[in-house]
Design a protein with these regions (language model features):
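Glycine-rich phosphate-binding loops of nucleotide-dependent enzymes
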Residues: 1-266
């Protein structure tokens, strides 16, 4: 196994039945700038080897929910529980140490650091320090980046160029590769394939499925219903900060999900 290569191992889902990796309980959040409730009493659970799709038109609380689970947003009420541990008072780094990865919609800023080179953005320093020791050589970092470039078909002619020189699609590939390399147990992915070409979308869908088959609990936030229906086991619809409907994928109808997203489904 090469450094940085994602190892996937098929898991026996029946033996994991009922094992919830992520629980969100009674989350309430109010935007301090508008004093408008953004999330109202949100509760959900995701099992190992399960993909929960979050559907909703932009602006209905999906980003805020992802930021709360990942630890970026700390000013909320309710509980976030990973592997049975209440992590509500913990920050981003502590949550990453519990094997929770966040692939944000905002690639530059939240995901990748603007003004920083591609190679520095690619190196998950905490991850490598825990495995390779505190002294990271530029050679090790470059080897790792080359592994990501090959594995995720990233077009990065100059690894020392600023990350902003990459196309949006290649930024997303870099970000996803960096977050998935440690085989996280819980993955929060917000619009992970937006801006990618068809070939890249198929490649990243396969990666998401492999992570699910490897036992990860995955929350997939997307406005693309075709994507949600292809990948999800269940779909929850957020409308005006509330869960208005939950669908099991085997019994879901794409038109009804669309109506729920518009607030029109009784």
């Amino acid at each position: 196994l090469m450094m940085g290569e994602i190892k996937t191992t098929k898991v026996d889902k029946e033996n994991m039945k009922g094992e919830y990796k992520l629980k969100v309980e009674n989350i309430n959040f109010e935007n301090i700038h508008s004093n408008v409730p953004t999330l109202n009493d949100i509760s959900l659970k995701i099992k190992s080897g399960e993909i929960l799709g979050i559907a909703g038109v932009s602006g209905n609380g999906q980003v805020e929910l992802a930021n709360i689970i990942s630890g970026i947003e700390r000013n909320y009420q309710g509980k976030v529980i990973v592997n049975g541990k209440n992590i509500s008072n913990q920050g981003v780094r502590s949550r990453k140490n519990l094997n929770l990865s966040y692939i944000p919609e905002n690639r530059l800023g939240v995901g990748l650091a603007p003004g920083v080179s591609i190679i520095d953005n690619s190196a998950v320093k905490d991850y490598f320090k825990s495995r390779l020791g505190p002294h990271l050589s530029s050679t090790k970092m470059l080897d790792y980046l080359n592994t990501l470039i090959k594995q995720f078909s990233i077009k990065a002619p100059d690894p020392r160029a600023e990350v902003s020189t990459l196309s949006g699609g290649n930024m997303q590939k870099l970000l996803m590769g960096r977050e998935l390399v440690s085989n996280p147990e819980v993955i929060i992915a917000a619009q992970p394939t937006r801006g990618l070409d068809v070939s890249a979308v198929e490649s990243l869908h396969e990666l998401i499925i492999n992570q699910r088959d490897n036992g990860a609990a995955i929350m997939l936030i997307s406005e693309d219903l075709d994507e949600l229906f292809k990948l999800s086991d269940r779909i929850i619809v957020l409308y005006e900060g509330e869960i208005v409907k939950e669908f099991d994928i085997d019994n879901a109808n794409i038109n009804n999900v669309g109506l729920a997203m518009a607030g029109s489904l009784e």
